[in-house]
A protein has these predicted regions:
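N-terminal export signals
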Residues: 1-6
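Generic hydrophobic/aromatic pocket-lining and core-packing "Φ" positions
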Residues: 37-38
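Active-site-proximal beta-strand/loop segments in catalytic clefts of secreted hydrolases
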Residues: 28-31, 51-54, 65, 123-125, ...
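Glycine-rich FAD pyrophosphate-binding loop
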Residues: 42-62
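N-terminal Rossmann-fold NAD(P) dinucleotide-binding loop
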Residues: 34
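Aromatic-residue-lined binding/catalytic grooves and analogous aromatic/hydrophobic interfacial grooves
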Residues: 9, 14-15, 45, 69-220
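Beta1/beta-strand and adjacent pyrophosphate-binding region of the FAD-binding site
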Residues: 17-31
Length: 220
């Protein structure tokens, strides 16, 4: 795979900036998932570019959502997620930090990217109208609003809204699927479900307790 680098394209923190080219993996997004996917693939030896539609890394975790739904089981963290929290701990000089400031989270994400030498392009939004080239049901390349084109063997949509998937014609559902679609007894709308969950102890707070239905045909 080849990649054309922009001149002097490197942040002070070591983040490598990139330009158009062909890659094993093209990751589109700015979320924590975008960072971890790009880092994991790069560590596996793939050529990777992270196309970031905004000017910062880390999505909500670097934008104010610095509290973690952590229930006391340290073993639930592993892999790059564990490395992220190790970086948070090191930043504060403490152990077991689970709430952090946005700028600290962003710096840890940047370090993960820089250490893995992942190439990043900031402020490049997908052209959702004509920017996805397909070969059958496979994405061949994507083009941004600025006109830059990126070819890849694989693509990952790591946005929160699924812009790349939608532009590629991937089917999707808005809201919850009915229980019958995939045979999931916990799918669909839940009403008055009070089955105990040990980590809450007061019933299932993830389910609706009022009769809320998001479909035109109730119960669909």
């Amino acid at each position: 795979a080849t990649a054309a680098f922009a001149e002097n394209a490197k942040f002070d923190d070591g983040t490598i900036l990139a330009d158009e080219g062909s890659y094993d993996l093209v990751v589109y997004g700015d979320s924590s998932g975008a960072v971890t996917a790009a880092v994991a693939a790069k560590r596996k030896g793939l050529s990777v570019i992270l196309i970031n539609p905004t000017g910062f890394l880390g999505g909500m975790s670097a934008s104010g959502l610095g509290a973690t739904d952590f229930l006391g089981q340290r073993r639930t963290f592993g892999g790059i997620a564990s490395e992220f929290y190790e970086g948070i701990n090191a930043s504060y000089g403490e152990k077991h930090v689970r709430s952090f400031e946005p700028h600290v989270g962003e710096q840890v994400f940047k370090k993960l990217i820089a250490d893995a030498q992942v190439q990043v392009l900031f402020d490049e939004k997908l052209n959702r109208e004509t920017g996805v080239e397909m070969d059958g049901n496979r994405i061949v390349s994507i083009t941004t609003l600025s006109g830059k084109t990126f070819h890849g063997k694989m693509f990952i949509d790591a946005t929160y809204v699924g812009d790349l998937m939608a532009a590629a014609g991937v089917s999707y559902t808005v809201g919850r699927e009915p229980e019958s679609q995939y045979g999931e007894d916990l799918a669909g709308v839940r009403r008055g479900d009070t089955r105990p969950r040990l980590h809450y102890g007061q019933g299932d707070k993830d389910h609706f307790v009022a009769e809320v239905d998001g479909y035109v045909i109730p119960g669909d």
